[in-house]
């Protein structure tokens, strides 16, 4: 804290916040003089983790205590005091983590859920290494149409130079390891790449911080950064992709093998991911819009499939050297919560390592069952997957199911302009 204030002596305010189950920032602004007392703990209502996407508290039948809005102590997460995108010289931001009434990490906090799953890997002497990619559209709020530059077009940095330079500058200031900004094939669609790391929880923190930072910087330049999974019906959607491998205690990649001769560790992890994939979709696609991205269109997966160097598969084995062999998980939408996405991915890999043998592995890898195409179907499949429910936590799983069903009911009750346009 003292080191930060030495670098940013003009700091006046600090935004202290939690990330709710949807990855939304929930918090408040305090004076910098109150930062020292906040470091010892501050209080937020437990119901922060029972909110839907619109911020409404959704209470499950098993947890009416939420309605009492009890406060819980929240402590700063080490290494997350950063300059804010909102006037970085005078404003900072700090991530918090909640504890329950007994002082244990709060079970509904997505960050805690991911920590628990990662700990299971470490218990086995396995260390996941991940690298995220997140896509978004940069929409000119003044223009009538978006400009297409083409996939990997090198002129994009000059076209959007002020925005890109500012984003790179602020990402560096926030210690976000942004390694690339890539132009996608669609008009004004970009992909943000973050450096691979074995600090799995920290990587997911960085995804949320980068998503927020991108939105703020875009607004400064008259753009809107749109991370919806499917913002335009005729264009490709936005995905949140994770590249993942497993290291041993010595740091050696346990997936290392020739592309056409995947080793047993890789094949078991693939089989586990495929087996849990239909149930996982309730997490990967957190709203109705996310399922529109998974309808047959361009390079987005519609089957629980895998393949070498193909972007139409949900699980892709990218081109790489043997020592850099990895799996790319392509199912999640850009609006998904990265903590929950990664906790679900790792759960699938654990399932393969703990429950699948060589005989059933081949059958699973050959199968490619279709994924649920509607949210209510995905939630129903999720409810019938005890391994995934247990891994994410029964309390969290109940809250997620209840919250998503409430959101779905509200959405389905809306009369759209398309309906009224064709009314008799």
Give names to the regions the model predicted.
Residues 149-157, 196-204, 251-260:
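Glycine-rich tight-turn/loop motif centered on a GG-T
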Residues 164-172, 178, 194-199, 211-225:
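Accessory "access/gating" subregions that flank catalytic or transport cores
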Residues 94-100, 190-197, 244, 329:
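Short, hydrophobic beta-strand segments
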Residues 20-21, 140-142, 246-251, 320:
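Short acidic-glycine loop/turn motifs at beta-strand connectors
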């Amino acid at each position: 804290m003292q080191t930060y204030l030495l670098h940013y002596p003009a700091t006046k305010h600090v935004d202290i916040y939690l990330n709710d189950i949807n990855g939304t920032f929930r918090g408040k602004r305090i004076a910098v003089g109150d930062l020292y007392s906040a470091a010892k703990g501050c209080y937020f209502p437990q119901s922060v983790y029972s909110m839907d996407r619109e911020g409404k508290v959704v209470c499950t039948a098993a947890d009416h205590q939420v309605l009492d809005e009890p406060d819980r102590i929240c402590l700063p997460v080490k290494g997350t005091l950063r300059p804010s995108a909102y006037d970085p010289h005078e404003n900072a931001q700090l991530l918090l983590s909640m504890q329950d009434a007994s002082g244990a990490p709060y079970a509904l906090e997505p960050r805690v859920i991911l920590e628990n799953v990662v700990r299971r890997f470490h218990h086995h002497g396995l260390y996941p290494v991940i690298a995220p990619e997140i896509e978004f559209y940069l929409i000119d709020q003044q223009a009538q149409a978006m400009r297409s530059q083409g996939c990997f077009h090198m002129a994009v940095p000059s076209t959007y130079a002020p925005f890109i330079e500012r984003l790179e500058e602020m990402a560096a200031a926030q210690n976000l390891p942004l390694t690339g900004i890539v132009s996608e094939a669609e008009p004004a669609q970009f992909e943000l790449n973050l450096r691979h790391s074995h600090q799995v929880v920290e990587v997911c923190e960085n995804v949320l911080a980068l998503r927020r930072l991108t939105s703020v910087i875009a607004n400064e330049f008259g753009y809107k950064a749109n991370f919806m999974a499917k913002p335009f019906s005729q264009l490709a959607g936005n995905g949140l992709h994770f590249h993942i491998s497993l290291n041993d205690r010595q740091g050696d990649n346990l997936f290392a093998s020739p592309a056409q001769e995947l080793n047993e560790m890789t094949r078991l992890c693939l089989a586990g991911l495929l087996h849990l994939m239909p149930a996982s979709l309730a997490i990967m696609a957190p709203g109705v819009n996310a399922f529109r991205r998974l309808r047959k269109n361009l390079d987005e997966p519609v089957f629980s499939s895998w393949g070498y160097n193909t972007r139409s598969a949900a699980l892709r084995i990218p081109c790489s050297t043997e020592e850099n062999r990895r799996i790319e998980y392509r199912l999640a939408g850009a609006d998904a919560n990265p903590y929950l996405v990664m906790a679900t991915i790792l759960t699938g890999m654990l399932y393969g390592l703990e429950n699948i043998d060589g005989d059933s592995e081949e059958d699973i890898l050959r199968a490619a069952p279709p994924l649920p195409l509607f949210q209510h179907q995905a939630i129903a499949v999720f409810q019938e997957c005890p391994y995934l429910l247990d891994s994410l936590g029964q309390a969290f799983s109940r809250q997620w199911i209840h919250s998503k069903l409430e959101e779905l009911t509200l959405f389905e009750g809306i009369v759209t302009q398309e309906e009224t346009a064709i009314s008799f």
